[in-house]
Amino acid sequence: MKGFHAFCVILLIFGSVSEAKFDDFEDEEDIVEYDDNDFAEFEDVAEDSVTESPQRVIITEDDEDETTVELEGQDESQEGDFEDADTQEGDTESEPYDDEEFEGYEDKPDTSSSKSKDPITIVDVPAHLQNSWESYYLEILMVTGLLAYIMNYIIGKNKNSRLAQAWFNTHRELLESNFTLVGDDGTNKEATSTGKLNQENEHIYNLWCSGRVCCEGMLIQLRFLKRQDLLNVLARMMRPVSDQVQIKVTMNDEDMDTYVFAVGARKALVRLQKEMQDLSEFCSDKPKSGAKYGLPDSLAILSEMGEVTDGMMDTKMLHFLTHYADKIESIHFSDQFSGPKIMQEEGQPLKLPDTKRTLLFTFNVPGSGNTYPKDMEALLPLMNMVIYSIDKAKKFRLNREGKQKADKNRARVEENFLKLTHVQRQEAAQSRREEKKRAEKERIMNEEDPEKQRRLEEAALRREQKKLEKKQMKMKQIKVKAM
């Protein structure tokens, strides 16, 4: 019984103590539940440390409607004691926001966002430049110019072809009646008549005729304007030019005498006298008027001697020159024809150019550039004049005095040429001798056999001594003749 009473006393004491503690918590208005387990307080703290607080998401909007998300990291002080963590969390929630503590924070730029992404700049483009033909005016001009050039090329090429064919159709019967071969293109070994023009390019056509007495052949060249070139077409608007027909007849040496003669437009003769080798050497006087023979004022004459002019200006030739003066550019007869002057970079040529007995005719096509196929018929009488001139050149012969004068003129021209080129020929001969000596020395030095090398040197010395002796003998002969 005593044990039972002692147990009751202990229960009463324990109950009074627990009731006193419960009253104390009510006064402080902070109620905490206690479990029967004495370590319940520690278990609650452990659970708080394991469960992480949810991360707070802060969403900020800027002026360009861009959003950035910032995540708060975990507290680095989780490894500290649990009571300090609870007290710190409670303090942050209970303490009011201090404006002075975060002063200037919002003014700082967000360096992390600027590094990760560059700002986008949107440029306002004017609406009239986006979908307008004015934006492509340069391309439009280039395409238009290209199309114009192509169209002009096709049209100009076709027109030149039509003009050439019209000329050939008009003159074909006359040519075939005077020449055996008409239209040889030179591709075959044997001369064959093709009966058509040879196109050299878009504006030049050739026709070779042969098989006639007193001449080797006749080359006809149709030189049309460059109608296929747009720039040339624009240039001709400022300065009109005519199409031309050039006829070159190569005479046999025995069928033409020695003389140089030319007749044609005054400006054309002045230009030819400067450019052509034979006219500049044998017709040094200025072009003379042909009024003495009844020629129009637009025509002038260049002649080596008066006898040639009198012989060429017969009635029929005067008829052609008078009636077709507007179509005649120049007529050039020469036994010393070599073409234009040869201009070399280093002085005069060392030898006279090769010459041929030639009759050269240059005619202007009517129309001054605005030519039509029907205008080619007007050139047919001029072709008759060419045929007549071939026969005239064969029949014409100089008298004895004229022949002697012509020979003196040719000897004078050759002598003047030799004087001009004497120094150059001496320099050329000296360079050839030095080159020959140099080659001989190299051959001697390259000889491996000493005995043979010695013999070659002795032979070279003997040759030099013989040359010196010959020069000395010539000098003695000159002195004897002078005495």
UniProtKB/Swiss-Prot annotation:
Recorded coiled-coil stretches: 450-483
Q: Where is the composition biased (Basic and acidic residues)?
A: 105-118, 430-472
Per the record, ranges on the Lumenal side are: 157-483
Region called Disordered, residue ranges = 44-118, 424-483
Q: Which UniProt keywords apply?
A: Chaperone, Coiled coil, Endoplasmic reticulum, Glycoprotein, Membrane, Signal, Transmembrane, Transmembrane helix
Q: How does it sit in the membrane?
A: Single-pass type I membrane protein
| Residue spans crossing the bilayer | 136-156
Compositional bias annotation for Acidic residues? 60-104
Q: Which PANTHER family does its entry note?
A: ADIPOCYTE-SPECIFIC PROTEIN 4-RELATED, PAT COMPLEX SUBUNIT CCDC47
The entry assigns this protein to a family as follows:
Belongs to the CCDC47 family.
Q: What is this protein called?
A: PAT complex subunit CCDC47
What is the native source organism of this protein? Bos taurus
